[in-house]
Amino acid sequence: ADAAHRNGTSIFAGIKFFDHTTGGAANSWASFIMTRNSDGSFRYTHPIINCMRFLGFDGINYNWESTNKYQDADNIAFHKELYKIAKSEGFNDFKIMYYTTSSSLTSYSSRYMWGQDKDNRICEVMLNYDNSDFSWNMGSSVTEAERTMGAADGLYAGVWIVSMDSRWNCPNNQVAKRCGICLWGEHAE
């Protein structure tokens, strides 16, 4: 992690692949992080921030494809709290990345992933790729990101690059080019 940081690269920890092969890991993790103390505060927000800072990690990456637990109010509140703690402790590079089955960020989905304003971020988002290609909704997703956060920083379009025959000109318009790109490698062949 130290070498990555010296070279300007963030390191994401706790990468969880919540797919059908894990036997319900997404639901177990969601239950774990939503545990509250007797005073109503989340039990594991401070320990997670402390652990990541100690180990030199900048954030958490989630693959929530097999569940919709990320839409639960407690999950939203938990992740907002992580951002608030990180900010209060000067952990300014802290990030949470969500990857779901969604290939667009909308006014509806930004309520449970992304956030509604700069002071209440829930996560950053990697849009799911469409048919092994860029999301067709990059432009509208950028518009929603900018409406809520003032910028599209933290919004990424996934593209599956195994065949390399993607619509590489897709981000070539003034709106879509403000979306980051996440190149997605092989996992099926």
Label each PLM-derived region with a short phrase.
Residues 76, 125, 142, 159-162, ...:
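Extended aliphatic helical segments
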Residues 113-120, 141-148, 172-174:
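Mature extracellular/periplasmic domains of secretome proteins
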Residues 134-160, 167:
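Glycoside hydrolase catalytic-domain groove-lining segments
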